Amino acid sequence: MPALSVLDLSPICEGSDASQALKNSRALAQHCEKAGYHRYWVAEHHNMRGIASAATSVVISHIAGGTQSIRVGSGGIMLPNHSPLMVAEQFGTLE
């Protein structure tokens, strides 16, 4: 079986909030892990009311804290918006 992955933007459902979106993403990652998925990706998006994945390293930490074996990572970081050193330090801390 090929290694399957998921890309999750942590969508905020109508009438809900970012906190619930992140809980939903964690639950989805847990279901994907049980189903045998290999990787779970999140991506950075800003100024979008319907997406809760602005702080990618925080989202990764939240999801990884609720899973055991699925690999959790970033599908995209907007480097022009961040100091490369800060990105390296944040992701180094997650290892």
Indicate where each model-derived feature is located:
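N-terminal beta1-alpha1-beta2 module of alpha/beta enzyme domains
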Residues: 1-72
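Glycine-rich anion/phosphate-binding loops
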Residues: 20-24, 80-93
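The substrate-binding groove and active-site-proximal loops of carbohydrate-active enzymes
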Residues: 73-81
